Amino acid sequence: MPEHVVDLHADIRELASWLERAVQLRDVIDAYLLTCAIAQVMDDWAEGTDSIPRRLTALLGDGGVARRGVRLAADIGLARRAVLDGREVRRVRAEVDRLVSRLADGVVADAEAGEHVMAEAGASVARLARGLAGLPSAVLGGLARPPSCFRSFDQHPRDCVELARRFAQQHPDRQRAGLLVLGVRTSGAYLAPLIAASLRVHGFGRAAAATARPGGPLPAAALAAARRGAAKGAVLVVDDPPSTGGSIAKIVRSVRRHGFEASEVLAVYASFGGEPARALPEDLPRVVLPAAEWHIRRLLGGARVEELVRRALAGQDVVDVASDEPGLPDRSGHLGVRVTAWVRDESGVRRHELRAEGAGTGYLGRHALEVAERMTGLVPAVYALSDGVLLRASGEALPASAVPADVMVGYVAARRERLRVACDRGSELRGRQPVWEIASRIFASGFGRLGPVVRPVLIDPLLRSALTSANPCLTDGTTAFAAWEKSAIGTVRKADYEDGFFSHLDLACYDAAYDLAGAAVALPETRPALPAAYESAVGEPIPPSRWCVYQCVQAWNLRRVGAADGDPRRAQARALQGLFGQLFLGDLDDEPTGPWCVLDVDGVLELDFGGVPATTVAAMTALRALRAHGFRVLLATGRSLPEVRDRCTAYRLAGGVAEYGGVAYGAGDGSVLDLVDGEVWGLRRDALVGELARSSAVRIDPKYRWCVRAAGLEAAAEAAHPWFTAVRGDAQTDFVPRGVEKAAGIRALLASLGEKDAPVTLAVGDTAMDIGILRMAERGYAPGHAGRALRSAGVARTRAPYQAGLAQAVGRLIGHRPGGCARCAVPRLRSADRLVTSLVSVGERGRRGIVPSMLELAVLRARLGRKAGPWT
């Protein structure tokens, strides 16, 4: 077995080599797919798809002076590229186009005609190989994007044939000037030539194919050819199944601006059920293949499945085969059916539980066989693969909570060892949402509207380098979803081992630690133990910042796909808490025994970081100073009990008051002190929840048990209740039982800790709900951003806002700037740790912190430019 597994993010040299092999084997499907991949790489290079100007254009959205300026810069760069290198590239690209068209004819034809096409293809491929060898290295090094249509979505070439038939049936006029099937890259680049070839079979002799990306240039020559002649031409815009239809809509609008009438531009696509593609123009003519008519459903029909089983078990006495009726394909994963086979041997008739499911077309699906072979014992046994349908062993589905942590760690470590690749190509996947690019989007949140400008220039290069793996492998990518099965003999196997990498969800990453982070998000109770177990298995620790970033991206993905299980925002918050706690407090072993300090959370200890609460460098430096100088810290917050518990664990705090004083938590023994009358309060709370729930727009946070936190309340928030005080926040309204108050909660908590009369030396809060704790403290401070209520109450304010204000308050208490003495100095952080914590901390000084943060990033970027290879 080769040392390295096949990487479908292949460059042109690899694609050309595989193409020559496909021609030798007379494999028309693979030859077609590989030639399309070469075309895609060349087109993306010619259009500068992944260049910084193009990416900035996309990030800046529609319109505006900035976007027009960046677009002009991109066009100038492409013009220069076309003059210097474009002639030879265009010549070879024309050769590729002719080969794609001819191979598409072979794919849609019958077997005999396809064989004839392949017999003729050898000379064309040899000529193409010679041409490719002379291309610039920038073109040869471009990477293929596996098409979602034939990799993730179970589309089949026969679906393209059927779409062409439906168009021909609806538009019988074969005398059109020309038909251009315009594919939306990437998937459209694979679908369009097949539809065009099928249209030629139906008598549309001038049907041709071309491709474009939304926001990119249109193929002007191909569009002009479609208009040539007296009769009207038409443009058929094709893509994989649209969710909103936004990509198709952009291309359609561009084509209409090119001079085509609305009736001359059509959308052609296969559809998932229940996705209305709302972004498509209402007047857009469409040719749609509904989910019920996809070819995969025929391939998974009873007769086809039985035939596949009998071929796979040839030589055995197969008594009978039964399978479920296939459902409808959807975006969540490959369509599959349960299969039961009864096989007779010397001991009698045995029952075998199997599953037949889509895997992908041609070499894109065959990749699953190689991965399964290398991962033997950890994934289900595979018996056959035919025409994009894989037959494998099946077992009982397991929930995430039932998967032992050691099994998860073993699986991740095995992928790291068995699925090694030659290099980490994630850094070359700009514009394709690899993990580092999504991490950049997440960690640019502090820059607000400047984020799209800062990301490509400063944040992207830094995170791209920081997340490059020294031991690259093909990751699973779906460990946060935990699709595991248990066999009849009790072994646990990863069922969707091939669905994540190279998928429509993107998120390419070559670091096995990313898969472990998915497990941490899915199994939060095992999260603390996973890094150590992984280090023990592979002999290498996971750097703290990398572990945090990977968890944040996994949580982001759970939010994106709308996962029903878990709490992605809380998972991301935990990841950030864990990073800051480890870096800033991990070396302070001695438990403080000195005076008490009370801190609010939101706006004081933490800020809003893209919709997720996060602490900052200033706040943690202040917290470190308090701990190092012997002060004990309690939290007083409106957040829920589970969230207070998370922070006490991460920040090593003695306890806290949650839900505005409704409940207190002692971290030492895990005690919970209920501070609201139970029975009466429960009835009143239930009544309020029922009242709020009458509005379908209202969302009740289930973590809150004493107060009621409700979002989506614009009108319902006015639902006054005599037993509650409504506290309006930026994104929610909290209903607090009357009489519940943070200061009383702190007193009760101190009493439960055996410190009933202990004074509070310092308190910091920023809202009217904090006035009680600020007045009870010997030193009560509000950060500089605090509102009018605290000013009216005469509370002392710091000059700086937010977490920088907290640091100033702590400095006044200890007599020097936090971190300014040997006792509380912050340990030296590694470059990657400093990068991530600095990105989270951009807002700790309000808007005044943005420019200094950009300068700090520029310095890091300059240092990176002088250093070869990845850095940590």
Annotated model-derived regions:
Residues M1-S332, E396-P404, R420-D424, I850-L857, ...:
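PRPP-associated nucleotide enzymes
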Residues V181, L623-R647, A697-E714, A726-A731, ...:
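Substrate-recognition element of Asp-dependent hydrolases with the DxDx(T/V) motif
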Residues H334-D460, F481-A482, D496-R546:
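Conserved ATP-binding subdomain of kinase catalytic cores across diverse folds
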Residues V421-D476, S487-A488, A571-D590:
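An alpha-helical support segment within catalytic cores of ATP-dependent transferases
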Residues S440, A444-G448, A517, A532-F584:
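Helix-rich C-terminal or lid/interface subdomains of diverse kinases
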Residues G562-V601, R834, L864-G865, W871-T872:
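Non-catalytic pre-domain segments flanking phosphatase-related domains
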Residues P592, W596, P613-T616, V736, ...:
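Mg2+-dependent phosphoryl-transfer enzymes with acidic/Ser/Thr/Gly-rich catalytic loops
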Residues A614-D701:
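Active-site phosphate-binding/coordination module
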